[in-house]
């Protein structure tokens, strides 16, 4: 996960926290967090990068809608990151 941008890490966490979200649901969550519009031209290429890296999987819900799920590798990467952060953030 060290090679991801902050935006990509945030996307990964959103996908992990939602139940098979479609792109628009991910977009809405990101906009709520960032408090500004997230354009499709930023969102979908970064989701595709996470798919290419094997951190999330893209499935097809219907002909127009894709959904995203966390892979086992994505889950491990998040757990490793949380453990690393805890090393520096623990009391």
Residue ranges and their predicted role:
Residues 1-20:
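Short alpha-helical segments that sit at the start of domains
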């Amino acid at each position: 996960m060290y090679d991801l941008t902050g935006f990509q890490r945030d996307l990964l966490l959103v996908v992990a926290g939602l139940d098979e979200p479609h792109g628009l649901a991910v977009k809405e969550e990101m906009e709520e967090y960032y408090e500004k519009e997230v354009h499709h031209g930023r969102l979908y290429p970064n989701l595709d990068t996470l798919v290419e890296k094997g951190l999330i999987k893209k499935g097809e819900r219907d002909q127009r809608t894709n959904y995203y799920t966390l892979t086992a590798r994505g889950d491990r990467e998040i757990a490793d990151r949380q453990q690393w952060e805890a090393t520096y953030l623990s009391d």
